[in-house]
Amino acid sequence: RVTQQNAFHNTLKLFFYGLLSLVPGKAEVPLYFVTGRFVVEAIAELTQHCEPQSIVHVCHSQDETPTLGELLDLAYDRFSEEEDFRVRNILRPLFCDEESFSLLAGEAEDMGATVMSQSLGSIAPFAKELFTVKDIKNDRFRAALKNYRAPDPKVLLDAVCGHLLKTRWGKRAG
């Protein structure tokens, strides 16, 4: 269940409605997503088992983390199960380089408040991150939690997409 939507959910919405034909980034970049519940439970447990003032990365390891390309493929496959997505013949978004995306977003912003400028503007703040492969180490985090287990990212994304589709991003009862 999605209780609070953020940039990730908004990006999926743009994708579903065909407003995102270009995606900044590289397919192989890992995206370190965690659920709110996971973070709350982890912090609660960390307060009991960690040294005071220690720094811990509350995230999954790179090998437990889906890439941008995998997430787009999973979302596209899930959206393709919906009749209203299929009938619009929406194509998978294409990856574009950082310079091209910046130029496009800047030109769209100069055109004023259009659907395109709004959709690109919602992605622009984190676009640079989608070009950088980061390998975040969570060894201390894993050691501190008794029952650490990363969720299956495919199952998680399918559930998120399913909820967003069912509620149409919060516009319908879930």
Identify what each model region corresponds to:
Residues 20-32, 53-59, 122-126, 142-148, ...:
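Glycine- and acidic
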Residues 3-6, 31-37, 66, 136:
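Residue-level signal for the nucleotide or nucleotide-sugar donor/cofactor binding architecture
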Residues 3-12, 114-118:
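Short, flexible helix-coil linker/hinge segments at the edges of structured domains or between repeats
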Residues 1-8, 71-77:
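Short secondary-structure boundary/capping segments
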Residues 9-38, 42-46, 57-59:
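A conserved pocket-lining segment of Rossmann-fold NAD(P)-dependent short-chain dehydrogenase/reductase
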Residues 85, 91, 127, 131-174:
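Amphipathic terminal alpha-helices
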Residues 39, 43, 58, 71, ...:
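Non-catalytic, hydrophobic alpha-helical segments
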